[in-house]
Amino acid sequence: MGQAVTTPLSLTLDHWKDVERTAHNLSVEVRKRRWVTFCSAEWPTFNVGWPRDGTFNPDIITQVKIKVFSPGPHGHPDQVPYIVTWEAIAVDPPPWVRPFVHPKPPLSLPPSAPSLPPEPPLSTPPQSSLYPALTSPLNTKPRPQVLPDSGGPLIDLLTEDPPPYRDPGPPSPDGNGDSGEVAPTEGAPDPSPMVSRLRGRKEPPVADSTTSQAFPLRLGGNGQYQYWPFSSSDLYNWKNNNPSFSEDPAKLTALIESVLLTHQPTWDDCQQLLGTLLTGEEKQRVLLEARKAVRGEDGRPTQLPNDINDAFPLERPDWDYNTQRGRNHLVHYRQLLLAGLQNAGRSPTNLAKVKGITQGPNESPSAFLERLKEAYRRYTPYDPEDPGQETNVAMSFIWQSAPDIGRKLERLEDLKSKTLGDLVREAEKIFNKRETPEEREERIRRETEEKEERRRAEDVQREKERDRRRHREMSKLLATVVSGQRQDRQGGERRRPQLDHDQCAYCKEKGHWARDCPKKPRGPRGPRPQASLLTLDDQGGQGQEPPPEPRITLRVGGQPVTFLVDTGAQHSVLTQNPGPLSDKSAWVQGATGGKRYRWTTDRRVHLATGKVTHSFLHVPDCPYPLLGRDLLTKLKAQIHFEGSGAQVVGPMGQPLQVLTLNIEDEYRLHETSKGPDVPLGSTWLSDFPQAWAETGGMGLAVRQAPLIIPLKATSTPVSIKQYPMSQEARLGIKPHIQRLLDQGILVPCQSPWNTPLLPVKKPGTNDYRPVQDLREVNKRVEDIHPTVPNPYNLLSGLPPSHQWYTVLDLKDAFFCLRLHPTSQSLFAFEWRDPEMGISGQLTWTRLPQGFKNSPTLFDEALHRDLADFRIQHPDLILLQYVDDLLLAATSELDCQQGTRALLQTLGDLGYRASAKKAQICQKQVKYLGYLLKEGQRWLTEARKETVMGQPTPKTPRQLREFLGTAGFCRLWIPGFAEMAAPLYPLTKTGTLFEWGPDQQKAYQEIKQALLTAPALGLPDLTKPFELFVDEKQGYAKGVLTQKLGPWRRPVAYLSKKLDPVAAGWPPCLRMVAAIAVLTKDAGKLTMGQPLVILAPHAVEALVKQPPDRWLSNARMTHYQALLLDTDRVQFGPIVALNPATLLPLPEEGLQHDCLDILAEAHGTRPDLTDQPLPDADHTWYTDGSSFLQEGQRKAGAAVTTETEVVWAKALPAGTSAQRAELIALTQALKMAEGKKLNVYTDSRYAFATAHIHGEIYRRRGLLTSEGKEIKNKDEILALLKALFLPKRLSIIHCPGHQKGNRAEARGNRMADQAAREVATRETPETSTLLIENSAPYTHEHFHYTVTDIKDLTKLGATYDDAKKCWVYQGKPVMPDQFTFELLDFLHQLTHLSFSKTKALLERNYCPYYMLNRDRTLKDITETCQACAQVNASKSAVKQGTRVRGHRPGTHWEIDFTEVKPGLYGYKYLLVFIDTFSGWVEAFPTKKETAKVVTKKLLEEIFPRFGMPQVLGTDNGPAFVSKVSQTVADLLGVDWKLHCAYRPQSSGQVERMNRTIKETLTKLTLATGSRDWVLLLPLALYRARNTPGPHGLTPYEILYGAPPPLVNFPDPDMAKVTHNPSLQAHLQALYLVQHEVWRPLAAAYQEQLDRPVVPHPFRVGDTVWVRRHQTKNLEPRWKGPYTVLLTTPTALKVDGIAAWIHAAHVKAADTRIEPPSESTWRVQRSQNPLKIRLTRGTS
């Protein structure tokens, strides 16, 4: 077999985790797919020798890196992270790369002089892209060599390799040189420079191997400078005997600094030095930082390219070191290079490295502190010696010290006041007091001896106790022997006869032993029971019987725990960690002392008496888990002591079964395991392999076309980011995602839709399943009518004659239906799996779960596919509920044949059933939560136990859970609605949860009813139904039955609460409502079959002739349409029902006539009549009037006789006519108290309320049918109360607005006229804001201050002694304080402006004169916080001056503008405008990104106009992007960002945007073309040739002449290109341009020199800042903020990072004072990023 070849690319892919870790350490991110693409496709095209399989050759990697880092359009910024990571792997190879990396070649050539023999070459592979399989170099890292100075002739370091060096011997003990070399003698003359360069190898080297003795530039004897290049030995020694720049930049910077100061290197030497000591990336960073340090003429860093290139060139300059100018350039260059080294050496902050510095076991605190400070200097920008950082260093010193020292330092008193020196001294004391190793060994030895001594003493004591016990037992034995001898002597010899080996000692019979003797009273001893879940004995151990202690084994959290029954323990105890603990704790007192322990959280425990919630005490040091009295009480346990030991049983004597488990796993307790009676054997699985999910795989409905999901017309794609997901959850759902990908159900995609994935943990396991949150998608998809069958009545189609059943559950049913490719993008979600190379979106190709229409779509598809099966098998009943199938047959054979046909059909159609859940050909099956057996449906025991086991609810949510679970079983509970009536009010939101006796009784009744739930027959649609109905206290109860022989078999128990209106009717009418409600519910089960209603009332006559005084027309019509349908509903004879069963009693009940009962029903007052009383004391007429007058509704009520008004009153505005009628009638009844009264009213509402409806309202609690409070509740209650005041009463209804001369007509007209007049004439007694009616103060309350008196004196007011107040203009004067309180209160009510409030006060009469009203009102309105935050403000800021360039191409403004329609993908226009000339450049783009901006800037603007100095833009994402700003920094461009939400700041380019778009619009209208890109040159031509503010066009400013309108090419143009006249023309153009440019620049500068102060805001002022995007009911202004810095047009405020234009702020107090004499001073601080502002007088 062949062996796979390992390549660098495959090696990195095999160790991809390490590659990602390396990239992460470099602060970059790499992707596997792009890694392969760049290595195999991109980098081989660079023509530097990069193979397609990759290489670790550093030279080739460097060449590729140079290509990638190339500036301009030829660079590849997207490949930077990948080549940097590849280089890091090659430079610092991990273990799996080292065998494949070339060792560095030795810095030597073949020796030119005798020297040591060269080392044998390493067997390394040749430099190639393909490496041999396994070739590993030596693992030992050679120590750096210190080479002597070269003695040979000088060589060219740039073209030749360095000379050979002999291998130095081991260093001398003092480290000053090699062992075989002698230092030079003292007094020797210094050699000349030439001698030092040409000395032989026999001369000893210098002591410092890192310092060269030949300086590159030195002064010779003739005054000329001589150049001496660096020797290769110096470069080698510097590189190998110093750390790299990345490891310790400070040390290498110090070395280079000394070399620069002492050697005076040239430009070439500096490049050689940097290239030797630094890597390529480090060198680039140093050069970049050095160029940033170049300063301009003003002493500040400059960004001008020419100044930077002059001071720090990147190419070799022509600096002559023999001239002073050249030497000055070199000195300046070295200074800049040193600054670049220092700036580049500032490594990024890495506090993790600092935290990793910990004190060693034997390290002193002082040494540890030095290491800590060094880490701060190396890995952070902070100086540990800075007093401001002393606190951080001190805390790190405490936390990272040795554990014993750190704990003691933390406990020091007044730790905050301790300095770092104090902490070090304390740490030194603790360190010095540590015990020495000898002392520690002595202490351990002493403790060991003491422990051994105690153990020996305990052994001796134990031995003595054992001997004492043995003597005591021996004494008892001897006493027994002596007693037996005495009895033998007294009674003779009584020896027991000898027994055979199989003889019983009790009955003396052979064949059994005594313990199995059947003649013993307790019978033979049975086999010992084995305890599985519960055991009363321990399992014992190693052949020994466990102690007879009562024990019970409980299963806690899935693990069995054996408890010791301890009646002395008050609480039950767990010893192992049970999971989360609560915050509660308890003090436990034991034999050895007391200690505090914590409680566990509540655990739900299922006991023999039901499920309870219990909390255990967690005591880890308890020797055994204890079952205390608290849980024994809940168990109702009984402990019996017998001869074999103690036994613990329940209250009924049964063994206890105790189990602790999670609530979500509770249902599994009650489900019976699948019995082995009908297993799915190999026959069913082998005969139909395509029908089972276990053998057929994932299903696919072959007859169903792919589904297209229609969207709503206004729907737009929704994209929601993936929620954060834990690592455990991601790993949990990863296998499911992988499985679905392998099956093709999930596929990668790119979609504008995205919804998050939610991992849901499966209960009781550590497995997760992926669930997609499709709620937002569901909102945007068209709704379809759900056709899924109702499980409530689905079984109505199953006749009782079919009693053989098969139940099938389809596996992954929704995944059987395909999605159309156009709809697959709707269900995309994010998923990243680096190991599989997946990073993007996945979507479903099948119908997903969680989609709202999935059940309906699948249900309809499966119905269509199974239609043929139903036609071919008419004798079988097939019920389908989504993916649950029930097949019913009359015989076992038919059921088996039908099941086979169904399985064959499902397999052919592509559906798969679950073999684990299948129930095939059984007479008893579970379907939809019901137990089907013998034509009846039962509640399953599991469902009963679930309801019975729930603890007493303590919250509304728990109660809703209980009612929901029990409500599913309501068909089996007679009168469920009445039972649960006390519970439902507690489930309402906002209701106080109070669990009382009534609720507990209802709770227990529902549970008890479930235990006795009967079997319900399946509805037989071939037989009629009978509905027995009863009603009690507003609750309808009934039972739906069918005849089964002579008996009535219940089909369902129905119950429901009547609405509040029907609940207030008489009993006979309530029965009508009850029958109507239950008939509607029964119709869901009868499916339109005939229904006979049996009730104890003759309701048929009531329905046919309903009393109109009780029922509304709408309700009457509804009842008649429902109950008088004779084809479906019939009424049976009147029967008396048993209240328990709701079935008829054998004896007949008392008969009554419902019509007679209703006729006798009366209202509130029995003697109330509607006929006039002949002997009445008074006859009155009442009326209420409500009408609109001048836009206001006025109302009044009156009580009159025929000729005079008895009582009349105006009612509050807005009162309705019905309410006014009730008030008038109630007032008449009150005035006639104790008298006989006839009262007439023309209001049907008031008449019906008094006679009929009032009592009905009172009975039903004054609620409407919806349960809401009725209108005019207070007036109705007052009327019902006033009905009993007169002695005798008659309320008579008369028509309103009658004509004629009858008494009723005259009285009614009189009452109506009086009500209208009083409503018009009088003002209702309501609270108003008029001062004269509700003045808060009187004259006596006024208190005038001294300031008030002065102001009053100036006004000329006089003091009135009688009124005791000041008077002005005939009105009492209100003091200033009272005026402020009144006006402030008025402003808080209205928040009107100053002018409108003043106008309001002047228009309304005021009895007082308000002192200083206008001034006070102005202060109140201007200082109101709410008004300041909401009211708009006029901008008083003057227009600023725009900064322009001083020549063309130096200052540009840039902006994006959107142009619609976007043809060919071009939707945006990138506009450049030169602020000096107005020249415009515009480029159509497809995207609005920073990449587009930088590309156009470098490819279009820079080559044609030169590098700009200033760029001005708004704060768009493309301009504030890091890419744009980085490019600007590299190019030295000053990028100015304008104020946010201030388009005037970019006014020139914004105006040009408008001009271009207007021109394009006109051109498209004129030409008829929609291609604006084609018309753009014409628009630019117009913009460039339009005169500006100075009368010149941008073309004329730039080119010095107008553009040629017509230009025909001349064929002889080439002949005159070198004509002298052409040169003269160019010179003239130059002169014209300067003549034009200079005045323009002067005009622009004149605008800037004008002293303008646009805004009055100063540092320290308080301002409000405008919100540019306000939400609903959000203030328009935010703040106030304090001004920190100002410019002529913008402000910097505290709390907002960006600058704010002055037009976007307003003063918090508009009364801005003029500038004072104080001035602000700016001072520098130690931090270069901070300034200090001080204020003082000038």
UniProtKB/Swiss-Prot annotation:
A motif (PPXY motif) lies at residues 162-165. A motif (PTAP/PSAP motif) lies at residues 111-114. One of its GO terms (biological process) is symbiont entry into host cell. Residues 430-435 are annotated as: Interaction with host UBE2I. Residues 438-478 form a coiled coil. GO terms for cellular component: host cell late endosome membrane; host cell plasma membrane; host multivesicular body; membrane; viral nucleocapsid. Mg(2+) 2 binds at D1183, E1221, D1242, D1312. Its EC number is 3.4.23.-, 2.7.7.49, 2.7.7.7, 3.1.26.4. The record marks Y131, P132, F215, P216, L478, A479, L534, T535, L659, T660, L1330, I1331 as: Cleavage. Belongs to the retroviral Pol polyprotein family. This is Gag-Pol polyprotein.
